Amino acid sequence: MSELRDTRLEKARTLEELGQGPYALTFSPSHRMAELQVTHADLPKGEERDVSVSVAGRVMTRRVMGKLAFFTLADETGSIQLFLEKAGLEAQQEGWFKQITSLVDSGDWLGVSGTLRRTDRGELSVKVSDWRMLTKALQPLPDKWHGLADVEKRYRQRYLDLVVSPDSRETFRRRARLVSGIRRWLDQRDFLEIETPVLQSEPGGADARPFETHHNALDLPLTLRIATELHLKRLVVGGFERVYELGRIFRNEGVSTRHNPEFTSVEIYQAYSDYVGMMELTEQMVSAVCEEVCGTTTITYQGTEIDLAPPWRRATMHELVQDATGLDFNGFSSREEAAAAMTAKGLHAPELADSVGRLLNEAFEQAVETTLIQPTFVTDYPVEISPLARPHRSKPGLVERFELFIVGREHANAFSELTDPVDQRQRLEAQQARKAAGDLEAQGLDEDFVMALEVGMPPTGGLGIGIDRLVMLLTDCPSIRDVIAFPLLRPESRKGEPPSVE
């Protein structure tokens, strides 16, 4: 590899000596590749069109055949063949054919001008009359046919992955369209996006361990946000009846194919709504954005057809667990009774699950979650695991909460929001006690948030959707690292250590 780099460095010096320069300042292409292909699709084989064009892009392949050469030049929209003829180039400037064929390598950025012709094989080509080196690449590209076989290298050197993989480029185009589609859908319905703090003195809104940092000037310990929930609710208190934020969240947790410590979510709050209203919003928005991005609401994920057309299935957590295990958690009077019944069914009942409600959630995660392939709203969660949700209007011990599962993964989480400040304080104090006892993921007591609730928050529905997992679904990607341009990876110097997997 070092010999190839040295050779390319020498070519860069030669270009400098010839007055070309290996790194141009600007170039003004007249067309992009896709535009040329569409506009001149009617050009017959073997014919030329006396139309002057200029294009720019990266040289992907090159073939030199005596007095002829053929390069493939690619920009973001597509590619086109360059037809280089010694006689034509030498007529423009002596030595040009030799220079372009000997000094230009695959990977270089090139700007060319010329006319159009279609080869006898039907390939639309630019017959080059003028060329300019835009950037001399010192490193070679991966093999054209095999790309980056090393999956980890694709993540570490995403720029190479994007150069050689049209599928990777399309994944990130779809991600961008999905994000803009969600914002557009919400904006058209009078939701207002407002940015909330990333640095916080009291993290809240989720059960998660935060990243910690320190503000030197104020001598103040801070954390990166683990959710946007509590600040968005403050905005509802302040009078913004439809508000959302789409942005980055940070949780100091393990990594897996479904988890990255830095990820993207959208949280949405709507006054005068509840969790039923947020179910309707979720299925309408996700299906609409899916159709916009994919052209259909029926997609295939890892070989399984998924139908995202509303309405989606709705089922309570109790119903799903009872159907899967035969256990009726409504009939258990103590934690010990529930744990014994779970053990008899071959389910694990961890000591940290210290109530019937927490054990119900454990049974759901072990026996049900991965079976929910088609879109399913799982509703009515135990109050113990939902400290920010409103008590259920008719089911004691439960809250008005749902999670959306597709292909066995959680994609969204929503509540009828808790607006009673006295109840909220009691629940956060219980969380604070768990935190003091060593639960690193328990929430603390945010006094200012409770004060905001005392000012008064109207009935509100709240929703959070994981953007990365939704992109995985719509791009048929098996790992979250495939849809995050630059995922967090262990330093190469520590690659031999066992992975930290959640």
UniProtKB/Swiss-Prot annotation:
Keyword DNA repair found: no
Record-listed E.C. numbers: 6.1.1.6
Amino acids binding Mg(2+) 1: 403, 410
Cofactor: how bound: Binds 3 Mg(2+) ions per subunit.
Gene3D superfamilies: Bira Bifunctional Protein, Domain 2, Nucleic acid-binding proteins
Assigned keywords, A-Z: Aminoacyl-tRNA synthetase, ATP-binding, Cytoplasm, Ligase, Magnesium, Metal-binding, Nucleotide-binding, Protein biosynthesis
Database matches in InterPro entries: Aa-tRNA-synt_II, aa-tRNA-synth_II, aa-tRNA-synth_II/BPL/LPL, Lys-tRNA-ligase_II, Lys-tRNA-ligase_II_N, Lys-tRNA-synth_II_C, NA-bd_OB-fold, NA-bd_OB_tRNA
Cell compartment(s), UniProt: Cytoplasm
Gene Ontology cellular-component annotations: cytosol
Example GO biological process: lysyl-tRNA aminoacylation
Subunit structure: Homodimer.
This protein's name: Lysine--tRNA ligase
Organism of provenance: Synechococcus sp. (strain CC9605)
